[in-house]
């Protein structure tokens, strides 16, 4: 077996970053919910 989590900054931003979230309707809903909840960090 090997470790399944191989962190990469670029990949993380591309998949879960602010620009990616803003690009789709559902992503914007995610940001809205996180703002309402009062999250300090909205995205990765």
Swiss-Prot record:
GO molecular function: structural constituent of ribosome
GO biological process, one term: translation
Matching Pfam families: Ribosomal_L34 (PF00468)
One CC-aspect GO term: ribosome
Keywords from the named record: Ribonucleoprotein, Ribosomal protein
Compositional bias segments (type: Basic residues): 7-22, 29-44
Signal peptide: none
Source organism superkingdom: Bacteria
Region (Disordered): 1-44
PANTHER family: LARGE RIBOSOMAL SUBUNIT PROTEIN BL34M, MITOCHONDRIAL RIBOSOMAL PROTEIN 34 FAMILY MEMBER
Protein family per UniProt: Belongs to the bacterial ribosomal protein bL34 family.
Protein name: Large ribosomal subunit protein bL34
Organism the protein comes from: Clostridium acetobutylicum (strain ATCC 824 / DSM 792 / JCM 1419 / IAM 19013 / LMG 5710 / NBRC 13948 / NRRL B-527 / VKM B-1787 / 2291 / W)
């Amino acid at each position: 077996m090997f470790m399944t989590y191989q962190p990469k900054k670029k990949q993380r931003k591309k998949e879960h970053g602010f620009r990616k979230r803003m690009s789709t309707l559902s992503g914007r809903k995610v940001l809205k919910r996180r703002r309402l909840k009062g999250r300090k960090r909205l995205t990765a």
